[in-house]
Amino acid sequence: MRNLDTPVKQIRRKIFTEIAKIGFESTDESMIHDIESIPYNIVEERAKYRESIYRERAVASERVRLAMGLSLRPENRSVHLTDGVKASNIDEKYYEPPLMQVIPSACSACESNKYEVSNMCRGCVAHPCLLTCPKGAISMVNGKSFIDQDKCIHCGRCKAVCPYDAIAHKERPCERACGVKAIESDEQGRASINQDKCVSCGMCMVSCPFGAISDKSQIFQLSHALREGTEIIAEIAPAYINQFGEDVTPGQFRSALKQLGFSNIYEVALGADIGCISEAHHYAKEVATGHLPFLLTSCCPSWSVMAKKYFPAMIDNISQELTPMVATARIVKKEHPHAKVVFIGPCASKKLEAMRHSVRSDVDFVITFEELWGLFDAKSITPSTCEELPEETQAATAAGRGYAIAGGVAGAIENCLKEYYPDIPVHIEHAESLAECKKVLTLAKAGKLKNCMIEGMACPGGCIGGAGTNAGFAKTSKALKKYVDSSEPKLPSQELENLELN
């Protein structure tokens, strides 16, 4: 589903575009009216996807609030759509948790963990499903298998033995996508997010076919700041390759960003280069010598938050190096002390990373590639038609640019170790998706991954599979590998280790 330009994606993009237009164009006098008009602009005279225009507009209204960085309205009392808007109309507005929220009016209350016999059942003589059920929940009704839901324990044995694959396992897509089991049910049977478990990776959001889960955005605040002429510098994550069209070159992408009003553009891969060298040094001095049994990378915030939440004894094993986003932002602020910094990337959880008190002074805005597309649309900018800008002087290495794909972080550190510490044996592990990350952390906890550098990526495929991406994984992976292979130099200089950014 993620490879397709679904109506869910189209609606989200329309919302982002409308919000960005208000930030760019609306006056203080017209802003409230313009915001209130968005649900009517999105849903005109007929409902396309739900039973009435009123429900569709109600859902669109909640999307508008989240896109402006506001929380959903309570269901038990009347709150105006624009309540809180004036307080959010400032450049310094940060996200207020929770970041990920279920829109109740959009949720279809999908059935969860249910086995059901489909019309594919042939009513065969063998009846393996009936024989294998440990609770006698299956009987023959009108010549077909039937599952008594009151007796079923959801073990799945019937499905496993059916020769016709006639038994369906119904799961909530959002629940199936969540690697930390944070999706639960409310009293209405609708999905709800246990915020104590959630690590804000956004996989539930991109897996819901009803678009019932959404995150908050700073697109309104950013577009308003750009309109005001604030000096804003963009730091772009290396996963930007292929996100705005297969034929869009890095130079055209930079040109499109300049047209939006960004005064300069830096690659986040620069910060990755710094981290790569520092992590290699840390591994050589601490892990290879046995002072630390293993070292966990920290560039993926959902991965590091999960490690802290679910494996608190491992906190000291999480790398303390600056993440690429923060390291790059500090380079920018060092060179442009009066500028604001926006991180543009594929990641939803970077929004929470930027909320940390230790990061707030470094990163002023975080938007995803999906939200950036809304900014481009609001300004009628098409990256593929923009002029080619030459590569900036602060170009990153192949190692840093490769951070965007699963295994790229560990691979870059491994290559630095082999180059700069050739006598040290290197043990590398990497995991992608939170479910796999939990498995590898369990192995580390059991002492089965000693003297090891462990890379974790919450999103399947790494950053290029993030919740805020526009393009499918397969084509992006191919394009990114081509870009990395053509990048020079291959490795960062050891001198970066001495760069003072703290």
Positions of PLM-derived features:
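Glycine-rich adenosyl-nucleotide cofactor-binding module
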Residues: 110-131, 160
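Gly-rich Lys/Arg/Thr-decorated short loops/hinges at beta-loop-alpha junctions or inter-strand turns
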Residues: 108-116, 139-144, 185, 203, ...
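Acidic, serine/threonine-rich, charge-biased low-complexity segments
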Residues: 74-83, 93-96
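Iron-sulfur cluster-binding cysteine motifs and their immediate structural context
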Residues: 126-149, 157-194, 199, 203-218, ...
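N-terminal [4Fe-4S]-dependent radical SAM core
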Residues: 89-118, 135
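Iron-sulfur-associated redox domains of electron-transfer enzymes in respiratory
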Residues: 1-75, 215-502
